[in-house]
Amino acid sequence: MNFTKSLLVLSIGVAMVGCGSDSDDIIVPDMTLRIAHVNDTHSNFDPVKSSFTMGADGKKVYNEFGGYPRLLKAADDIKAGAKADKEPLLFLHGGDAWQGTAYFKLNEGAANADLLSQMGLDAMVLGNHEFDLDTDKLASFINTVSFPVLANNMDASKDQYLSNVDNLYPYQLFAFEGSEKRAITSVSDASDDEKVVAVIGVVLGDMPTIATGTGDVTFSDQITATQATINDLKTKGVNKIIVLSHIGNAADKELAANTTGIDIIVGGHSHTLLGDFTDLDQGNNGIYAEMIPQKDKVQKTCVVQAGQYAEAIGDVDVSFDINGNLLSCVGNNTLLSNDEFYHDSHREHQMMSSDKDDVTSFIDNNDKITIKDEDIDLRTRIDATYKPALEAAYGDVVAAAPTEIGHERRPGDAGTDKHGSDVAPMIAQGMIYWANQQSVATVTGKNVQIGLVGAGGVRTDIA
């Protein structure tokens, strides 16, 4: 695909007329920046079994999306493209790297720290699931990773463990000269030839209400704290502001609309694959790179997010004028597929010859999905270091579903009906069955008739 070339040309074209401007005057950008981003990867080191449809003909294809080695290869390809174009780049993680698979249960964040450190990330914001254990485990994770961890509306000074970490910051400054990049601690560290960009971390202000391991950490209002941080950065001479958030797409828009000075919000938490993926039967969850008017109604903030489970990567080009105002913000999410395709959910009937060629041709002509190889070194590291314990923990397969039982967190996603997940009701029914067993009912003295389960706690299809 020629996505990289078309993305750059379109971005420059928009920058020349100005973003949200009524003027036809040519505005020469002071700086362009490319951002690759992921979020809510949830320990999906291996690919996720999935499916998509081939446009109007509705032919269903069973495949795999993502996994850390495929995600790394995609990120490296984006970095190589930016370097070839002499374009500065940041690679950002929107939080919730923890939980999701048995890899996390077996390693409690240690494997996540190891593998994320191989990714070449520039920064990560804390998600709510990073607080699922205790702050001791989180402190170990933060001290181990090779990139800064961010949260500006959080005070860890009274926590026994997090108060001592030296890799947790409210924001991180980056100095760019052409495509060359370095992290700096103060604006004064930048030379006259370098452009300074701030990445501010924003976490949930109500974190203790949904996370169990917050310790003695306190959290403050997302909007108030972030505006104060922006104002402080502005007084120091920083006028190019990126927010790396884990508060959800709706809250990202609210943050953009109630502050001034944010150029782009790179989000997470709501698992929102922004963009129109209806031709792939993956739903339409809103505009990628949507422009939200800021509180002053003069400038706009661009909002992006890249789905879930390391299945996709976001790639966006932004440009700024000399005052740090956003001129353009153009890009999209791309689903990362393997190159083995099947006719059935059990992966027993592989597509060969012309069938596979048809799928490959469809993908090559669709900028929302791509076939991507895995990074060999990272795959080897996972298979040698972490997979043996995972396979031993899972044991033998004891049953199989004759047909795929679908799961989506939100009704209407990926072709589901108004009721959404088919897996979640089965789990709720299983809870009723368990509660009404004689051994349990004898203790509770209850006859349970209703089972409730949050669909967000269900993570995958059954196939």
Mark where each language-model region is:
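Bacterial N-terminal signal peptides that target proteins for export
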Residues: 1-7
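C-terminal motif of bacterial Sec signal peptides marking the signal peptidase cleavage site
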Residues: 15-18
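Acidic, metal/ion-coordinating pockets
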Residues: 23-338, 451
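Solvent-exposed loop/linker segments at secondary-structure transitions
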Residues: 34-35, 39-49, 83-90, 98-105, ...
